Structure formats: C-alpha cells, structure tokens
Amino acid sequence: MLTAQQIEKLDWEKVAYMMPVIVQHAISGDVLMMGYMNKEALNITISSGKITFFSRSKQRLWTKGESSGHFLNLVNIYPDCDNDTLLALADPIGPTCHFGTHSCFAPAQTEWGFLYQLEKLLASRKTADPDHSYTAKLYASGTKRIAQKVGEEGLETALAAAVNNREELTNEAADLMYHLMVLLQDQELDLSCVIRRLRER
C-alpha cells in the first residue's frame, strides 16, 4: 500500500492535482473503471479501504457505491513508473458500472476474467435444482463422485496428449478444468487458493 512519503512523491502538479486512477479487479484482472483522485480522496481510499474519487462533475469527494452499495474494496494501489497515474486493485461488491455490468468497459473481459465468472457461476449452482443443472447434480452426488470425475477427465486428458491429438487434448483439458473447479468449490476452495500455493512454491 502507498505510504505517506510515496503519496508526496506522486507528480501532482503534472496532473493538475487530479491523479488518474485505473481500477482493476484484483482476481480476474478485468479493468473495471477509471476515475480521478486528489490527495484527500487518495488518503480516504487508503484509510477506509473503499475506493473514493473526486467527482469533477459534482465537485466533491465520491465513494464508489455510496448510494448503490456496490463498493470497490481496495486490495492494493500502485503508482506507475512516471508517478502520474495509479493502478488500484479492487474487490468489487456487485456490478461496477451504473448500467449494471461488471465493468464500465463491458463487454471487454480477459481470459482470466472468464474463469472468475465461471467460478462464480459454479458456486451458485450449489443451491440449484439437480434436475435442471448438471453441475448441481454433480454437487448432489457427493465429493467422492466429483473426485472420481476429476480422475477420469485427468486420464482422458493424458491419453489425448499421448497420441498427439491437439483437438481432443483441448476438449479434455476443458472438461478436466471444469470438474476440478467444481471439486474445489465443493471443498470451499477456489482458484485463488491454488494460485497462492503456486506462488509460495
């Protein structure tokens, strides 16, 4: 997180004391929005943990989500190499855009952003009707059955690679990823847990 010393080192004069801030989803990497912060807005953002801008149209401080409840919870914030732009990593509560989309730049989405949305969808299927959802049926079948499916798909993925069938390898890898994500959700885990463990190694 930015220190008071780093905040003072930002090139405020260059940007007329209105620092451009790009807000990026801390997990998916999707760019959510951009806005401007003066020093007060930046200090409030860091102290409150909720991204706060200076609204040039309203001429006042504005905490994203103050009326809708769709806050952008601050994870971290970084200056760029010229100290005239900030990148804020955030955990959004609800949609970011006032049009109801996840990003003000929708439908733009990264590949990792799709995985994040898929993970949210799989989590929501835990309470769905097993008669109308294959994923819900998997959850209802229990952990052992889900784990068995991961094993089966892993074997099929390996066999496709062994015979150099790239098309089938892609298909089987997708099936394996899907079932692995279901298993992680079943165990109250997610891809972020796996990524953190990989970083530790």
Swiss-Prot record:
It is an enzyme of class 3 (hydrolase). One of its GO terms (cellular component) is cytoplasm. CDD domains: NTP-PPase_HisIE_like. SUPFAM superfamilies: all-alpha NTP pyrophosphatases (SSF101386), HisI-like (SSF141734). It is found in: Cytoplasm. HAMAP family: HisE, HisIE. This is Histidine biosynthesis bifunctional protein HisIE.
